UniProtKB/Swiss-Prot annotation:
This is Mediator of RNA polymerase II transcription subunit 28. Keywords: Actin-binding, Activator, Coiled coil, Cytoplasm, Membrane, Nucleus, Transcription, Transcription regulation. It holds the Pfam family Med28. Its main location: nucleus. InterPro entries: Mediator_Med28. It is found in: Nucleus; Cytoplasm; Membrane. Component of the Mediator complex, a coactivator involved in the regulated transcription of nearly all RNA polymerase II-dependent genes. Mediator functions as a bridge to convey information from gene-specific regulatory proteins to the basal RNA polymerase II transcription machinery. Mediator is recruited to promoters by direct interactions with regulatory proteins and serves as a scaffold for the assembly of a functional preinitiation complex with RNA polymerase II and the general transcription factors. It is a peripheral membrane protein.
Length: 178
C-alpha cells in the first residue's frame, strides 16, 4: 500500500494513519491526525458531530436567555461555528486525500465512477426531455382542439341579423300586467 499523502501539499497536516492490518477495506475511519489534541478513541466524524451539537447548544443555551451580554453571546457562537468549520475542513481534507490515494492506486475505479455518474446524468436528462415532450404533446393537442372548435361554421349563424334573431329567441317574453 502506498504511503500516506499527508503533508504533500504545503500547509496540510499529515494524513491519518493507515488501516490496521487485520481489516482490509476499512480505514480506521477518520481517526484523528497525529499530533492533534484529540482523545485516542475520537474520530473526525465524532468531533464533527459534537461540534455541530455544540453550535446548536450555544444557540439554545439557557445562559443566553437569562440576559447575557450580546457581544459575549456572539463571541461564543462564533467560536463554536469556527470550530465546526475547522473540523469540517479537516474531514473534507481526509476524504480528498483518500480520493487521491484511490486515483493513484486504482485509476480504473475512478474512471468507472465517472462513467457511472455520466450515465446517471444522461438518464436524468433523458427523463427530463421525455417529460417536456409529454407536456409539449399535451399542449399541442389542446391547441389543435381549440383550432378545430373555431373552424366549425355550422354552429354559428352567418350575418348580424341571424345573430340578433338567435339572441332574441333566448330572451323570455314579458309578463302581462293583470
Amino acid at each position: 500500500m502506498a504511503a500516506p499523502l499527508g503533508g504533500m501539499f504545503s500547509g496540510q497536516p499529515p494524513g491519518p494513519p493507515q488501516a490496521p492490518p487485520g481489516l482490509p477495506g476499512q480505514a480506521s475511519l477518520l481517526q484523528a491526525a497525529p499530533g492533534a489534541p484529540r482523545p485516542s478513541s475520537s474520530t473526525l466524524v465524532d468531533e464533527l458531530e459534537s461540534s455541530f451539537e455544540a453550535c446548536f447548544a450555544s444557540l439554545v443555551s439557557q445562559d443566553y436567555v437569562n440576559g447575557t451580554d450580546q457581544e459575549e453571546i456572539r463571541t461564543g457562537v462564533d467560536q463554536c461555528i469556527q470550530k465546526f468549520l475547522d473540523i469540517a475542513r479537516q474531514t473534507e481534507c481526509f476524504f480528498l486525500q483518500k480520493r487521491l490515494q484511490l486515483s493513484v492506486q486504482k485509476p480504473e475505479q475512478v474512471i468507472k465512477e465517472d462513467v457511472s455518474e455520466l450515465r446517471n446524468e444522461l438518464q436524468r436528462k433523458d427523463a427530463l426531455v421525455q417529460k417536456h415532450l409529454t407536456k409539449l404533446r399535451h399542449w399541442q393537442q389542446v391547441l389543435e382542439d381549440i383550432n378545430v372548435q373555431h373552424k366549425k361554421p355550422a354552429d354559428i349563424p352567418q350575418g348580424s341579423l341571424a345573430y340578433l334573431e338567435q339572441a332574441s329567441a333566448n330572451i323570455p317574453a314579458p309578463l302581462k300586467p293583470t
